A protein has these predicted regions:
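N-terminal secretory signal peptides
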Residues: 1-53
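N-terminal twin-arginine translocation
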Residues: 41, 45-60, 68-96
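Mid-to-C-terminal alpha-helical segments outside catalytic/metal-binding sites
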Residues: 53-70, 95-102, 108, 123-124, ...
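Active-site gating/metal-coordination segments in enzymes
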Residues: 90, 174, 179-297
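Hydrophobic faces of well-ordered beta-strands that scaffold small-molecule active sites
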Residues: 110-114, 175-177, 212-214, 239-241, ...
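Conserved, mostly hydrophobic/aromatic
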Residues: 113, 239, 359, 396, ...
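Divalent metal-dependent hydrolysis catalytic cores, especially in the metallo-beta-lactamase
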Residues: 115, 132-155, 164-186, 209-215, ...
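Catalytic pocket-lining loop regions of alpha/beta-barrel enzymes
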Residues: 251-393, 401, 418-429, 475-496
């Protein structure tokens, strides 16, 4: 059988569903998004017949992705949402050359927010829900390339699965493996396991493809003092932290406070790793988070910290995006949460665009794919106020499966001319898109993109990717929780109540 995964073609190549990254409860799709998925499914069947292909063969082609995105355009336009769209010619639904032109590219893609966890047996051990566990995770589908070979029968989320989903099933060239906010003892991915994943990639001659963060939560005793040891032992490329984190549930902390923020920044400076990545926006699950979760996820401290520490690069993970409020154009005001709180903080502290603050897109872009008009506002605001050289690519995968659909959607996304004229948003040109995909993040991570691309072009991972794509068999699956019940099971699994 040609396809081991989804042989009937029931799954769309652009995965717009309720899946989350486990940090917040799934939210239902809007009517227009449900209509978009339904129309895309109908068009896939019709276009497959016109092309003389099976439904699955059609959907795994670039025409299948183009057909899906074109259906999304049609459904959203019918709902009056025309501020953003996927810029694809109609012919791409049936003409492979047109689809390839629209959906493929040679950009350097550097995903600075990747996740996996250690083998599930150990992770599940403390939980009373071991018997049911993450029953929604399609572990039986993780026999990717060769069921009898090195890549066969791996568990979802492990290092091998991460390497396959990230580097074989997507166009990602480099990635950063990051962490979730827990105490060190409860981390679902420890520093040594992250380093082991990097070694797995390097064993495939994939040196330089995977970097790792050092997790530091300054209000946990000992975390700041461990930073030098972490850097020396694991060669961390940046620090990852969470201002919502709380050891007692009472309060978080701020980047500009003297008790926690200032010591963290100084210790980062002392290690020589002057890059601090801060989760902002998306609410996080209790009990490890403060009760004022959304408040401490706001960005009012970012501008102050950036102004006081011009030698430090602050990368705002998720760009401060808050899922509870629909984004529109920015207007100055008392913004305490959301993307607008980031912009307001920069403006109040005279931080001009393209300074030492970066806006990262992990989960944010994936969530915005539901609503291209909201996407136009969020992307437009970030590019206008944070800067065209300071918006950086991240996907939060592999919670969302392979990030290839996020890449294809962003490759074709455009802000409508009417929005550009009315709000001063820039056109997303191929050159700007390439900067967001990888060039912008190369500065804080101290990469020479030319040297990296030259090396990556001929390593074993590149050769394996080329061979695999002669007969690709993507799963089109997502792995994070998709319903509230799954989300609650997931929290219990991690020891949350």
């Amino acid at each position: 059988m040609r396809f081991r995964h989804d042989p009937d073609g029931s799954r769309l190549p652009i995965k717009v569903d309720t899946t989350t990254n486990g940090e917040f409860a799934p939210r239902p799709l809007e009517r227009s998004t449900r209509a978009a998925n339904a129309l895309a499914s109908d068009r896939a069947g019709a276009n497959a017949k016109r092309a003389g292909l099976s439904r699955r063969s059609f959907l795994t082609s670039t025409c299948g992705a183009a057909s899906t995105l074109l259906a999304f355009n049609e459904a959203h336009a019918a709902a009056g949402k025309t501020g953003g769209f996927f810029d694809i010619p109609l012919a791409a639904a049936l003409e492979p050359a047109a689809a390839d032109t629209a959906l493929t590219g040679r950009e350097f893609i550097f995903d600075i927010q990747g996740h996996h966890v250690n083998p599930l047996d150990r992770w599940r051990a403390p939980s009373m829900f071991t018997a049911t566990g993450l029953k929604f995770m399609p572990q039986s589908k993780c026999d990717y390339l060769d069921p009898d070979g090195e890549w066969g029968h791996v568990k979802c989320f492990t290092g091998q699965a991460f390497a396959k989903e990230m580097f074989l099933d997507s166009d990602t060239d480099m990635a950063v493996l990051t962490f979730t906010p827990t105490t060190y003892e409860d981390m679902p991915l420890t520093d040594d396991e992250a380093a082991a994943t990097r070694e797995l990639v390097e064993a495939m001659d994939g040196n330089h493809r995977l970097l790792v963060h050092g997790r530091v939560v300054p209000n946990i005793d000992g975390d700041i003092s461990r930073m030098a040891e972490l850097h020396e032992q694991w060669n961390v490329s940046a620090w990852k932290t969470y201002t919502q984190a709380s050891v007692n549930g009472s309060e978080g902390w701020w980047l500009d406070d003297e008790e926690y923020g200032a010591p963290l920044i100084q210790k980062a400076r002392d290690t020589g790793v002057n890059v601090i990545c801060i989760h902002k926006g998306l609410p996080l699950p209790t009990p490890f988070m403060t009760r004022d979760n959304r408040l401490y996820g706001g960005c009012r401290d970012v501008g102050k910290a950036a102004k006081a520490n011009p030698d430090i690069d602050f990368i705002i993970y998720h760009s401060g995006y808050d899922i509870k409020d629909k984004d529109g154009p920015f207007a100055p005001g008392d913004h305490r949460i959301g993307v607008d709180s980031l912009i307001q903080s920069l403006m109040e502290n005279d931080i001009p665009p393209n300074s030492n603050v970066y806006a990262e897109l992990g989960t944010t872009w994936r969530y915005l794919m539901r609503d291209p008009e909201e996407a136009a506002h969020v992307m437009g605001k970030l590019l206008k106020y944070v800067g065209e050289d300071r918006v950086v690519w991240g996907t939060d995968s592999i919670w969302y499966g392979s990030p290839q659909d996020q890449i294809q959607a962003f490759r074709t996304f455009q802000i409508a001319p009417e929005f550009r004229e009315q709000y001063g948003y820039p056109e997303i040109t191929p050159e700007l898109r390439a900067r967001i995909f990888g060039v912008n993040a190369s500065k804080p991570y101290r990469l020479s993109t030319a040297e990296v691309q030259e090396y990556l072009g001929g390593d074993m991972v590149a050769r394996e990717r080329e061979n695999y794509r002669n007969e690709p068999d993507p799963t089109f699956l997502t792995y994070g929780p998709r319903t509230r019940r799954e989300f609650l099971d997931f929290l219990r699994l991690k020891g949350h109540s």
